[in-house]
């Protein structure tokens, strides 16, 4: 069996990072020379909790729009499988401070969101019944109350 490709997040020492934070997880260059940056938008300390599936699903729907409102070039905002945060792909290489400010603004929008959740119908969503706006808003408030920071990448010592 061939070796599996290296996955950046498996090299991160999850015991040494301090959530909540924004972290540049990597930059890829496309064959045409464009840069795509991946950011780790961490809500919870790894291995010390997880966001409920309905809440993280709602965060995904809200941050998909709100991050685009505050940061140019957002390609995608998706939940981490561990449910402690989101990954965001963005065209170019925005600086971490700018991403942090955009994330903070998007979290403020999320915390104050008092309208229907966007994209929540059988036509628009693959699991449209699984949402929790109140919990999503609370997670946004919790991160804002704790304060965001830029987290450096701390690699495992192997």
Swiss-Prot record:
* Keywords in alphabetical order: Autoinducer synthesis, Iron, Lyase, Metal-binding, Quorum sensing
Cellular component terms (Gene Ontology)? cytosol
Recorded hits in InterPro entries, A to Z, give:
LuxS_sf, Metalloenz_LuxS/M16, S-ribosylhomocysteinase
Known catalysed reaction(s)? S-(5-deoxy-D-ribos-5-yl)-L-homocysteine = (S)-4,5-dihydroxypentane-2,3-dione + L-homocysteine
Query: Gene3D superfamilies in the record, alphabetically?
Result: S-ribosylhomocysteinase (LuxS) (3.30.1360.80)
Q: Which cofactor does it need?
A: Fe cation
Q: Which GO terms describe its biological process?
A: L-methionine salvage from S-adenosylmethionine; quorum sensing
Q: Answer whether the UniProt record assigns the keyword Iron to this protein.
A: yes
Query: What is annotated about its quaternary structure and interactions?
Result: Homodimer.
Q: What does this protein do?
A: Involved in the synthesis of autoinducer 2 (AI-2) which is secreted by bacteria and is used to communicate both the cell density and the metabolic potential of the environment. The regulation of gene expression in response to changes in cell density is called quorum sensing. Catalyzes the transformation of S-ribosylhomocysteine (RHC) to homocysteine (HC) and 4,5-dihydroxy-2,3-pentadione (DPD).
**Protein name from the UniProt record:** S-ribosylhomocysteine lyase
Q: What is the lineage of its organism?
A: Bacteria, Thermotogati, Deinococcota, Deinococci, Deinococcales
| Gene that encodes the chain | luxS
């Amino acid at each position: 069996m061939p070796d599996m490709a290296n996955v950046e997040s498996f090299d991160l020492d999850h015991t040494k990072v301090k959530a909540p934070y924004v972290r540049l997880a990597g930059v890829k260059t496309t064959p045409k020379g464009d840069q795509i940056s991946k950011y780790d938008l961490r809500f919870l300390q790894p291995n010390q909790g997880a966001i409920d599936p309905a809440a993280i699903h709602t965060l995904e729907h809200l941050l998909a729009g709100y991050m685009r409102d505050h940061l140019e070039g957002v390609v995608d905002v998706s939940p981490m499988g561990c449910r402690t945060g989101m990954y965001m792909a963005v065209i170019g290489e925005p600086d971490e401070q700018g991403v942090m400010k955009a994330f903070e603004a998007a979290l403020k929008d999320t915390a104050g969101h008092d309208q229907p959740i966007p994209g929540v119908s059988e036509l628009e969503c693959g699991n449209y019944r699984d949402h929790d706006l109140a919990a999503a808003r609370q997670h946004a408030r919790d991160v804002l109350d704790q304060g965001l920071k830029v987290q450096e990448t701390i690699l495992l010592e192997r």
